[in-house]
Amino acid sequence: MKNILQSTECLEDQQNVSMRPNLLDDFIGQSSVVNNLKIFINAAYTRKEPMDHVLLYGPPGLGKTTLAHIIAKELKVNFRSTAGPLLSKAGDLAAILTNLQAKDILFIDEIHRLNRNIEEILYSAMEDFCLDIIVGEGCGARTLRVDLPPFTLVGATTRIGLLSNPLRDRFGIPIHLEFYSTEELTKVIQRAAKVIKTNISNSGAQEISLRSRGTPRIALRLLRRIRDFMEVTEHNKIITDTFADKALLRLGIDKLGLDRQDIQYLKFIYDSNNPTGIDTISSGLSEDTGNIEETIEPYLIKINFIQRTPRGRVITEKAISHLREQEYI
């Protein structure tokens, strides 16, 4: 039980815990999502019922885990957390489900990585709050039904297309998280700077937000790294736009927030002179296809630097102009 219920957040996320809002009123960005969640949470709380199952999906780093924590806090219930890859056996999931209390939140990160056998166990658990366990083997095998306390499953995924239709359809509240605007990220950075007691000018916060790829997780990481530079090298002890720019360039982050990995990806497609398949890119860059599709491509598609076509990935003229302006090619 200890292993499969351990925190599934990476070290970077753990360092962000102190900056994490605890209530929806403190959550910056995703305004329509927040407003709808307030309705759903208040309705469930008023009826004294478990909230309907929630599916949070979208690119990495937009606040899926944070929202799951907030839902539990707003409902004043326990929060249990695991991840799809950790649930390799039916017994793993059964152990978690049978230890839940009424109205608890069960958060499954990377839910798209559940194997099909585990997924099928979830069907009856989500719909009927029961668990069908096969006891015995062969002709003597029988099904034992175990009742479960009503609970809320919150699933998170960066690749909703990999979820099976039966599982996806069992989530009554699907929520799509989108990239943040520069203004929203500036507020995220300013709030975080106060939490970690770091002085930052408005222009400094905006400079970081412009280069954070529309992603709070990246913005918070860059803020921490720039703070490191400031504490060691800057005598004014305040992050200005000029200082942020210098620090970000030292970190290999260009004016649009692209890093060395992005540039290598774009140059590879540019040098190919033709639409390039994901497997070819993966092999050429020695990068996992999942990392390319989940981490690298979403932002490049958003800013119209690449296009996905049936024949492969195509670099746009806008991207080529940027590569030339920055003297990458």
Curated annotation (Swiss-Prot):
Region (Head domain (RuvB-H)) location: 255-329
Region ranges (Small ATPAse domain (RuvB-S)): 181-252
Binding site for Mg(2+): 65
Highest taxon in the source lineage: Bacteria
GO cellular component: cytoplasm; Holliday junction resolvase complex
InterPro entries: AAA+_ATPase (IPR003593), AAA_lid_4 (IPR041445), DNA_helicase_Holl-junc_RuvB (IPR004605), P-loop_NTPase (IPR027417), RuvB-like_N (IPR008824), RuvB_C (IPR008823), WH-like_DNA-bd_sf (IPR036388), WH_DNA-bd_sf (IPR036390)
Keyword Cytoplasm attributed: yes
Main location: cytoplasm
Keyword Disulfide bond: no
Stretches for region Large ATPase domain (RuvB-L): 1-180
Subunit structure: Homohexamer. Forms an RuvA(8)-RuvB(12)-Holliday junction (HJ) complex. HJ DNA is sandwiched between 2 RuvA tetramers; dsDNA enters through RuvA and exits via RuvB. An RuvB hexamer assembles on each DNA strand where it exits the tetramer. Each RuvB hexamer is contacted by two RuvA subunits (via domain III) on 2 adjacent RuvB subunits; this complex drives branch migration. In the full resolvosome a probable DNA-RuvA(4)-RuvB(12)-RuvC(2) complex forms which resolves the HJ.
NCBIfam families reported for this sequence: PRK00080.1, ruvB
HAMAP family: DNA_HJ_migration_RuvB
Protein's name in the database: Holliday junction branch migration complex subunit RuvB
Organism lineage string: Bacteria, Pseudomonadati, Pseudomonadota, Alphaproteobacteria, Rickettsiales
